């Protein structure tokens, strides 16, 4: 599956447009991770636990997006837009949302 932020793919023509596809993942933030991330922010450095959560959520959202596109008969998704949002009480959850257009492509 080809995924791209651009509306076209170099070296490919778009044969069919199948519509908008979306992948979403919501991850809960752990209280202890929050505590250690706050300490790390104070002393400097990167919060590895949050980076892992972001990576996991992003991978899950991409997997969902690609699955939806394949189920429509697409072999690519163009115009990808990736958004992160903090949701829930006191920002207790992270949502990753990816959208794009499912298409059928062939080489030029």
Curated annotation (Swiss-Prot):
Belongs to the UPF0145 family. This is UPF0145 protein MADE_1007770. It comes from the Bacteria. It comes from Alteromonas mediterranea (strain DSM 17117 / CIP 110805 / LMG 28347 / Deep ecotype). InterPro entries: UPF0145_dom_sf, UPF0145_YbjQ-like. It holds the Pfam family YbjQ_1.
């Amino acid at each position: 599956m080809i995924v791209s932020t651009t509306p076209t793919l170099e070296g490919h023509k778009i044969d069919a447009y199948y519509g908008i596809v979306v992948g979403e993942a919501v991850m809960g933030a752990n209280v202890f991770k929050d505590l250690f991330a706050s300490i790390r922010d104070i002393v400097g450095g990167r919060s590895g636990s949050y980076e892992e959560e972001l990576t996991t959520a992003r991978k899950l959202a991409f997997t969902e997006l690609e699955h939806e596109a394949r189920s429509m008969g697409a072999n690519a998704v163009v115009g990808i837009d990736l958004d992160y949002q903090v949701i829930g009480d006191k920002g207790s959850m992270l949502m990753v949302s990816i959208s794009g257009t499912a298409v059928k492509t062939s080489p030029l």
